[in-house]
Amino acid sequence: MVHRLTALIPMAAAGVVLSFASNPAPAEAAPGSCPTPTLGRYAVMGMGVQTGKASNTPTAHVLEERWLAGGKLQGTVVERVGRSERQSSYSGIARMNASCFMELERKLPWGTVRSEVVLDGKGRPLYSINRNKGTVITSRWLPMAPGSCQASDLNGLVLSSQVGLSWRDGGWSPNAVVQRERWSDGSVQGLALSSYGGMGETVSYTGQLKLDPSSCWGNLSERDAEGVAYNYRALVVKGRSGARGYLYLQSDPDDLTAGWLVHD
């Protein structure tokens, strides 16, 4: 049995408002009351399941996506499907439909991914749902400021609450974690309050974030006081003055967790 997945991310902040330059066919033209989409760069985190005849497979993803003029998309995605991981850059298209939802179509090596996004009154994407048959996946969106990131952008206090799944005895078991972290130039010391399969524990950990060159993506490696290693693909969410926090997706096959860790 696959347990339902949820994730919480605070509401997105303001971005730079520009107009999409695409000209959809008259039958697809959005009403004049629709908000003008906000172009820019976004961090996206989603969780859900891919349904199958025999069983459901949990899935989660983290994306960095750019909304460009002319309804064009460019991005990078890291995705977990069960115990496997895949990642790729991609391109796509976006258009406003008659219901004032943005329809996105991403071209990926493993297929075309379609989703619909709800915008707030200022045209900022907040939530989306996957529209591919056989998927039950929702995502939340955060704006990112232009430019690359530094590990030192996270210096200070970072807090999080997240849920995930662990592979045990041939099936997925739920887990939940609350964390408090202190960051200094890419090094982290933290304390985690966790429950795995209903068994609670409190454990300290340390780790190191190594960012890719000229990027906001990086690899985060952590080890707790009991010697257990944890590995993540991380995306620092760049703000206009330092980092707003970071998203991560766990790489360890037996643990599937995506989290939004907020810089205080």
Functional labels for PLM-detected ranges:
Residues M1-A12:
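Bacterial N-terminal signal peptides that target proteins for export
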Residues P10-A21:
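Bacterial N-terminal signal peptides
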Residues A27-D264:
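Mature soluble binding/inhibitory domains
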Residues S19-A29:
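Signal peptide processing junction and immediate N-terminal pro/mature segment
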